[in-house]
Curated annotation (Swiss-Prot):
Residues given in the record as GTP binding sites: 32-39, 59-63, 77-80, 144-147, 176-178
GO biological process: division septum assembly
Cofactor(s) listed in the protein's UniProt record: Mg(2+)
Single GO MF annotation: GTP binding
Gene: engB
Residues engaged in binding Mg(2+): S39, T61
Keywords attached to this entry: Cell cycle, Cell division, GTP-binding, Magnesium, Metal-binding, Nucleotide-binding, Septation
Keyword Metal-binding in record: yes
This protein's name: Probable GTP-binding protein EngB
Protein's job: Necessary for normal cell division and for the maintenance of normal septation.
Length: 195
């Protein structure tokens, strides 16, 4: 899959089903805990610096952000989970919005769950992965921040994450660095398999 970085647009930031765009394109949702590097991942995959806004402030994304990727697919940036400073009522509101999207959206073909390669998956990571599996949602696990781990230890960290998530044999796990950006084509090819 080849992407023209000059043909990428944020279509809408939605908070309810009535606002979801009707594009006829397959959708790939990006999920992960706050500050796992979702925005950096999106920007590096599409070859743009600031398409998805990165933030030092966790819990910043509070909407479903729909990006048209070169009229080939839609990336949907989902609010990060597991950020304690978001109020309980806000968390419940996000949870309902995300659940509605993940379980009812027919154009959703894949969820990319991002986890931090440096750490064990959090309880929220495990809950999210189990949730996706419960609803039979195809999932690609991408371990971010690969550049922060010594090359010789990457496979050990991946194995650990696989075990902690109890990864489904049908799901793929891959490590990635938004800074080094060396596996971009490999990930596009994996995504294309689901569209």
């Amino acid at each position: 899959m080849n992407i023209n970085p000059n043909n990428i647009d944020l279509i809408i930031s939605a908070v309810q089903e009535a606002q979801y765009p009707d594009t006829g394109l397959s959708e790939v949702a990006l999920s992960g805990r706050s500050n796992v590097g979702k925005s950096s991942f999106i920007n590096s995959m599409i070859g743009r610096k600031n398409m998805a806004r990165t933030s030092q402030q966790p819990g910043k994304t509070q909407t479903l952000n729909f990006f048209n990727i070169d009229d080939q697919l839609i990336f949907v940036d989902v609010p990060g989970y597991g950020y304690a400073k978001v109020s309980k009522s806000q968390r419940e509101k996000f949870g309902k919005m995300i659940e509605e999207y993940l379980t009812k959206r027919e154009s959703l073909k894949l969820v990319i769950q991002l986890v931090d390669l440096r750490h064990n998956p959090t309880e929220d990571d495990v809950l999210m992965y189990n949730y996706l599996k419960h609803f039979d949602i195809p999932t690609l696990v991408i371990c971010t921040k690969e550049d922060k781990i010594a090359k010789g230890k990457i496979q050990k960290h991946i194995k650990n994450i696989k075990e902690k998530l109890d990864l489904d044999p049908d799901d793929t796990i891959i490590s990635y660095s938004s800074i080094q950006n060396t596996k971009q084509q490999q990930i596009w090819d994996l995504i294309a398999n689901y569209l």
